[in-house]
């Protein structure tokens, strides 16, 4: 048996149990009538016969212990997709339904709504820890990437009952702590997921993020240079840092910190120190000038964005760009001259995680206690 995956047919295993004598005879006749080639005892036919199967599990894209249930004569073979199988076998809230699965979101590579929601399901293990207990802002593209978009902070009135919220400054922010909520948002075509630097229960950040924003896509090498210079500094102070491509045109550096170990004012001491050090060392390459017209061809080191009430794109969030790019965590050895943002699309990221671990898998285990000491020393020097 096989399933449609993008433009290919993915072989998913086989079945023999569950067929009655009559059903087996019907199936054999259909195969004989439509066979294209034969290799040994194996007969090959074009896709066309749809069946419902019961199975135990999916392992390495293979179904195990499959059992025939029924022929599905009302379905076309191209409706039988791997994404549909993955979504159909999740333990989700009953109120959650996928609407308009064939709606086109990206044209090249072709990704429809079903494939996008399937991406969210497959990436949820890695993405949900960063969304957990944070006031979520999304950017929705209800008619696909080529259509209009808008920011959404409030839970809409029509949201199902399982969508949880927290009130903050007059907004009912959605709290995305589970797969059902994430997939409901995906079905609403929330393409971008922006998160604050703190949980809703806290007043202080649980991470620091530097946003390295080159003036244009061609200046991406400046982001690579800035990131590597930052790593040298962080390593010298035993600060554990994690880079990610933004999915747009830059690189972002995440630094996890212990909850309530630092205030926003204290983290500003550190971010300002790093930014000013780099622009003094490389004045022709980097700037902290907020007005774009005054930056010239220099990369903007955005340390101001790390503040209460501000947000950053969530790791593994898709971006509302022409290509289905993803804000993808990197290993530091990947931050080199070969790095290209456009490489990190939905299909690439899923394949990457099938064959490698997540670069941020230890993120929430880090406390970076040395950062507290460093900030104290910087403040002490400034007071002299």
Which functions belong to the PLM regions below?
Residues 7-28, 158-167, 219-235, 255-285, ...:
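Helical (often loop-to-helix) elements that flank the catalytic cores of nucleotide-handling enzymes
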Residues 127-143, 149:
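Short N-terminal amphipathic alpha-helices
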Residues 138-142, 241-248, 288-293:
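Short beta-strand
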């Amino acid at each position: 048996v096989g399933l449609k995956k993008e433009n290919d047919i993915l072989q998913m295993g086989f079945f023999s149990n569950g067929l009655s004598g009559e059903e087996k005879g019907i199936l054999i006749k259909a195969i004989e009538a439509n066979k294209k080639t034969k290799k040994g005892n194996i007969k090959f036919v074009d896709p066309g016969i749809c069946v419902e199967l019961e199975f135990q599990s999916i392992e390495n894209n293979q179904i195990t212990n499959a059992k025939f249930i029924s022929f599905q004569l009302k379905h076309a073979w191209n409706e039988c997709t791997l994404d549909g199988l993955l979504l159909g076998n999740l333990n989700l809230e009953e109120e959650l339904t996928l609407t308009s699965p064939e709606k086109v979101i990206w044209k090249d590579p072709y990704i429809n709504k079903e494939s996008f929601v399937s991406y969210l399901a497959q990436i949820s293990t890695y993405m949900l820890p960063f969304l957990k207990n944070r006031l979520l802002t999304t950017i929705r593209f209800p008619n696909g990437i080529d259509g209009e978009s808008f920011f959404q902070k409030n839970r809409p009135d029509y949201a199902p009952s399982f969508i949880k919220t927290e009130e903050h400054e007059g907004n009912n922010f959605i709290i995305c702590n589970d797969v059902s909520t994430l997939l409901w948002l995906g079905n609403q075509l929330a393409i971008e997921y922006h998160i604050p630097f703190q949980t809703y229960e806290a007043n202080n950040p649980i991470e620091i993020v530097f946003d390295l924003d080159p003036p244009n896509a061609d200046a991406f090498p400046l982001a690579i240079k800035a990131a590597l210079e930052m790593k040298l500094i962080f390593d010298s102070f035993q600060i554990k840092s994690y880079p990610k491509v933004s999915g747009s045109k830059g690189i972002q550096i995440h630094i996890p910190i212990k909850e309530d170990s630092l205030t926003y004012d204290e983290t500003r001491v550190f971010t300002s120190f790093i930014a000013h050090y780099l622009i003094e060392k490389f004045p022709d390459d980097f700037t902290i000038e907020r007005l774009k017209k005054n930056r010239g061809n220099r990369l903007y080191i955005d340390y101001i964005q790390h503040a209460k009430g501000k947000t950053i794109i969530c790791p593994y969030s898709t971006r509302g760009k022409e290509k289905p790019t993803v804000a993808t965590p990197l290993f530091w050895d990947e931050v080199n001259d070969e790095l290209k943002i456009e490489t990190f699309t939905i299909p690439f990221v899923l394949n990457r995680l099938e064959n490698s671990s997540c670069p941020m898998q230890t993120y929430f285990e880090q406390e970076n206690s040395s950062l507290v000491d460093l900030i104290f020393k910087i403040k002490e020097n400034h007071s002299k």
